[in-house]
Amino acid sequence: MLNMSKMFVGLFTVILCLAGTLSVYTQEPTVSTPMTLAPVPLETVSESDQYSQLSMEMAQLRSLIEKKADKPGASKGWSAPKIGGRFFMDYVNHMDQDWDGLPLGSNVTSQNWCGFREARIAVTGTGYDFLDYKLELGFEKNASSCPSYKDIFLGIQHVPILEYVRVGNQYVEDGGSEICNGTTNYTFMELPASLGQQFMSRRLGVTSRHLLADDRVRIFLGAYNATNISDSHYVKDDNQGIVLNTRTTIAPVFCQDGRRLLLVGAYYNFTDSTGSRPLAFNRPGGWDVYNPTGLGNFYSDRYQKAGFEAVMQAGRFCVQTDMFLQNYADVNDGAGSGIGNQTNYGGFIMAKLFLTRNDYRKYNLKNGNWDSVDVSRPFKLADVQGVNWPSGCGAWELAGMYGVYDSFVFSTSVPAAADAKMMNQQVGAALNWYWNPNVKWAVNYFHDMTKARYDGDYYDPRGDYLGMSCRVSF
């Protein structure tokens, strides 16, 4: 009984404790009277020393910007001129020639040479946010003692409808991307033979360029004087002729300055009163060497050229092609003796591969041509503990090319009624080493194959050429 009473006492104690706890949690909270705090004065931002110092620095910076904008060379005037150019040293060796059987031909071994090839110096600049200019002079191996005019033009932006207009001596875009490069960015030392034989180079004229679809569509129009103005002694005559030229390119794929590129284009050239023109050259591109099958000059009342171009570049690898047709109306010797209308065709295909990773050639959509090589690891000398060691390997490029050009042959030394044709085929290989975007070492090898027919006789001359070059641009 005693144990039972103790158990009841303990149970009663637990119940009392639980009841007390529940009463605490169920009790209504006590509401306290809020305290009123006295206002504390705070320093405003405009009165702080830090803000005053920042305002003074901003005012000084604004004053410097305004003073710089007022100086010549800002958007209110002309920029400071920039000087650029290039310098080429070439070596050319003619190996295994077989030209002796050709009319007016001869062995060309004596034309091997090594030395200065070409130099250019140019001044460029901009002004008033809508003008640009370029003045360029050329010094070349076979030119006269006087420098020749190259690019000399004034460009005007934001022209209604035409968008961008150039006036002056400039390239006639009667070819694809390779033609419009200028010699600085050629893959080979010269143009493929099919292009280097018949194109207009520079002429005095007016051109316009219109860009659409984020610059992926480019439309080019030009009107020029048909006569080449090459030196300061040129005197205009009364029969200058006119050149009308257009070129359109479309790049549905373009990223990273052309690292991924798919481009197609077409061009057309019409020339009235062509004047005296050299015949097709059987030589590697435009090298300044003897021409074994260039049989004089001819005249033509009208000249037309139409072509197609395409480029596909995927990183280090690129394939490029250009094909064209030419038509000469009333080919003659300038004295009435001629062979009527003549049509030529030609083209080339080129494959290029950079052997070094992450290197590729950039493409300029606005200008419609190739730009400099993007060299990820430039070759240079680095100071390591007082000793200069090579650093970086530069960019190495391997290229192959096949070109063909089928043309008529005309010369005052061959009867006008003669059935004369010539087909020139050329295969080439190139190994290029770019120390950086401005320095290039090149080795080129060409094999030239020509099938010629003069007055019923057939000729099959061939030749091999080795070329090396050091090219520096700045």
Predicted regions and their residues:
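Outer-membrane beta-barrel pore domains
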Residues: V31, V45, M95, N107-V108, ...
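Long amphipathic alpha-helical scaffold segments
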Residues: E57-S79
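Short, P/G- and charge-enriched loop/turn segments at secondary-structure junctions
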Residues: D70-G73, A193-L195, G294-N297
